[in-house]
């Protein structure tokens, strides 16, 4: 298992910034009204920063930094180095209860949970393809799926099982991953260069992440959106 390391002091400083400090820099725009992401100017970086919220997906050809916080959820970072486009999603599998999560398995392709996960992955991939990326050139880095206490521990485990099985089945070029474990993460991604930085954080600093994911989990409608999505076999 490959783990992405943080090597630049500015990245460390940013990762340790509290969500309350970052919140003062939030500048919502009209296209962000759905709440999937928001963009702001970082005080010590010349680029725009975009935070992807649970259930969101964001792809860009601009020089930006995409970031998110991950508890039980997983994120796939994908990019085409030649076209200089990249993006990130942030999702979890929807389960109605602990019994359902215990009996789900990655090969249950027709289950609502698997279909939701496939949709989250295909939205990211198709969005990059629409921006000129070639599927054969796409590279992926996978993050998240922490085994948190209680019911959420099963959710994190199942999210990891799903994303690994999906990557294997669809023959995705996964070049790095940092999955599982017992701690939430903060994740930064440069979509043009394909560089990613991850910092595991303590539970005392992860209240906002946990709250966002709980709200997302309660709001998930397991009816897959009607938009046509191509599943690559």
Swiss-Prot record:
One Pfam family of this chain: CheD
Molecular function GO terms recorded: protein-glutamine glutaminase activity
Enzyme class name: hydrolase
Matches recorded under InterPro entries: CheD-like_sf, Chemorcpt_Glu_NH3ase_CheD, Cytotoxic_necrot_fac-like_cat
Keywords assigned by UniProt, alphabetized: Chemotaxis, Hydrolase
Assigned EC number: 3.5.1.44
CDD domains registered for this protein in UniProt: CheD
Disulfide bonds: none
Biological process terms in GO annotation: chemotaxis
Catalyzed reaction equations: L-glutaminyl-[protein] + H2O = L-glutamyl-[protein] + NH4(+)
Database matches in PANTHER family: CHEMORECEPTOR GLUTAMINE DEAMIDASE CHED-RELATED
Function of the protein: Probably deamidates glutamine residues to glutamate on methyl-accepting chemotaxis receptors (MCPs), playing an important role in chemotaxis.
Protein family: Belongs to the CheD family.
NCBIfam families hit by this protein: PRK13493.1
Record's protein name: Probable chemoreceptor glutamine deamidase CheD
Organism (species): Vibrio cholerae serotype O1 (strain ATCC 39541 / Classical Ogawa 395 / O395)
Organism phylogeny: Bacteria, Pseudomonadati, Pseudomonadota, Gammaproteobacteria, Vibrionales
């Amino acid at each position: 298992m490959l783990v992405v390391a943080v090597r630049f002091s500015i990245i460390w400083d940013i990762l340790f910034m509290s969500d309350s400090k970052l919140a003062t820099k939030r500048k919502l725009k009209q296209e962000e009204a759905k709440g999937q992401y928001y963009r702001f100017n970082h005080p010590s970086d010349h680029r725009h920063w975009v935070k992807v919220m649970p259930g969101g997906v964001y792809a860009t050809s601009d020089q930006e930094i995409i970031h998110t916080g991950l508890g039980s959820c997983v994120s796939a970072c994908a990019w085409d180095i030649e076209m200089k486009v990249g993006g990130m999603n942030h999702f979890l599998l929807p389960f109605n209860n602990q019994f359902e999560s215990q009996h789900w398995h990655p090969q249950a392709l027709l289950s609502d949970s698997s279909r939701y996960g496939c949709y989250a992955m295909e939205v990211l991939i198709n969005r990059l393809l629409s921006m000129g990326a070639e599927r054969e050139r796409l590279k992926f880095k996978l993050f998240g799926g922490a085994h948190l206490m209680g019911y959420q521990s099963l959710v994190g485990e199942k999210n990891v099982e799903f994303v690994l099985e999906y990557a294997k089945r669809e023959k995705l070029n996964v070049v790095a991953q940092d999955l599982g474990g017992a701690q939430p993460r903060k994740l930064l991604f440069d979509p043009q260069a394909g560089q990613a930085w991850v910092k595991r954080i303590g539970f005392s600093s992860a209240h906002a992440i946990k709250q966002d994911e709980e709200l997302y989990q309660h709001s998930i409608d397991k009816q897959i959106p009607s938009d046509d999505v191509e599943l690559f076999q």
